[in-house]
């Protein structure tokens, strides 16, 4: 079994976006610690299955980040269930989770399932609009969400999500200092080695996504930048 607490770098693939077989092979053979499959919209059982079958040709660990209960399928190593802590809609805090447990609770392997406490910080991002996230947060607001995830809810992952834009590294540093047991995931706007290294100083796990579709070479370079190998 893989140990997610040791993952430093992961790629995130959107099942609703096209990626060539050649680029997928590069991603899966890059030395990244895992590949997360997930997106904010257009996630279906068909495109999730297509992505799963494609990734399973390689040895890399594979995670489904659940945003649509109807797109859940067996075959992934782990399942990440996001709870958007700064969402104004209860369905993104506990609603989707309740639905999933009603449908799959009897057959869930709890060793494969991890909750993520998301704090979404880019109001322009699809995920912010979908979840109606309150993004105009102060530093104290964000730290309070981090403490909530870590100390009140005892979540294994606190995820700072800037989705499409590069975030505030000083804030990442301060959030990391607050967390005792939760691992800090950072996602958003990483497009080069410099940014990847900068964030990796503080985040436990750096998530690289959009740049895969914009500049595959730059995406691949982030692996060594983060892991220092």
Swiss-Prot record:
Record key words, sorted: Lipid biosynthesis, Lipid metabolism, Magnesium, Metal-binding, Phospholipid biosynthesis, Phospholipid metabolism, Transferase
Q: What EC designation does it have?
A: 2.5.1.n9
Q: Provide the reaction this enzyme catalyses.
A: sn-glycerol 1-phosphate + all-trans-heptaprenyl diphosphate = 3-heptaprenyl-sn-glycero-1-phosphate + diphosphate
Q: What class of enzyme is it?
A: transferase
Q: In which pathway does it act?
A: Membrane lipid metabolism; glycerophospholipid metabolism
Cite the InterPro entries for this sequence: GGGP/HepGP_synthase_I (IPR039074), GGGP/HepGP_synthase_sf (IPR038597), GGGP_HepGP_synthase (IPR008205)
* Names of required cofactors: Mg(2+)
The organism's place on the tree of life at top rank: Bacteria
**So where does sn-glycerol 1-phosphate get bound?**
12, 159-164, 189, 209-210
Q: Which GO terms describe its biological process?
A: glycerophospholipid biosynthetic process
Q: Which GO terms describe its molecular function?
A: heptaprenylglyceryl phosphate synthase activity; magnesium ion binding
Record-listed Mg(2+) binding positions: 14, 40
What exactly does this protein do? Prenyltransferase that catalyzes in vivo the transfer of the heptaprenyl moiety of heptaprenyl pyrophosphate (HepPP; 35 carbon atoms) to the C3 hydroxyl of sn-glycerol-1-phosphate (G1P), producing heptaprenylglyceryl phosphate (HepGP). This reaction is an ether-bond-formation step in the biosynthesis of archaea-type G1P-based membrane lipids found in Bacillales.
Please give the subunit comment from the record: Homodimer.
Write down the HAMAP family for this protein, in alphabetical order: GGGP_HepGP_synthase
Q: Which family does it belong to?
A: Belongs to the GGGP/HepGP synthase family. Group I subfamily.
Record-given protein name: Heptaprenylglyceryl phosphate synthase
**Species this chain originates from:** Bacillus cytotoxicus (strain DSM 22905 / CIP 110041 / 391-98 / NVH 391-98)
Q: Which gene encodes it?
A: pcrB
């Amino acid at each position: 079994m893989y140990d997610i607490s040791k993952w430093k770098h992961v790629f995130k693939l959107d099942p609703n976006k096209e990626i060539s077989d050649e680029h997928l092979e590069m991603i899966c053979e890059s030395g990244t610690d895992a590949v997360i499959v997930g997106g904010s919209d257009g996630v279906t059982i068909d495109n999730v299955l297509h992505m799963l079958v494609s990734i399973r040709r390689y040895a890399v660990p594979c995670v489904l980040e659940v945003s649509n209960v109807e797109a859940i399928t067996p075959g992934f190593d782990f399942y990440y269930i996001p709870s958007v802590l700064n969402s104004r809609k209860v369905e993104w805090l506990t609603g989707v989770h309740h639905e999933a447990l009603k449908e799959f609770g009897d057959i869930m392997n709890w060793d494969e399932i991890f909750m993520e406490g998301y704090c979404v910080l880019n109001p322009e991002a699809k995920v912010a609009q979908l979840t109606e996230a309150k993004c105009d947060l102060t530093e104290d607001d964000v730290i309070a969400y981090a403490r909530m995830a870590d100390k009140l809810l005892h979540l294994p992952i606190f995820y700072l999500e800037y989705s499409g834009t590069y975030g505030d590294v000083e804030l990442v540093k301060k959030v990391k200092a607050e967390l005792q047991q939760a691992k800090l995931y950072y996602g958003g706007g990483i497009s080069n080695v410099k940014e990847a290294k900068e964030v990796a100083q503080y985040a436990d796990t750096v998530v690289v996504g959009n740049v895969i579709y914009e500049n595959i070479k730059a995406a691949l370079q982030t692996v060594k930048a983060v892991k220092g190998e």
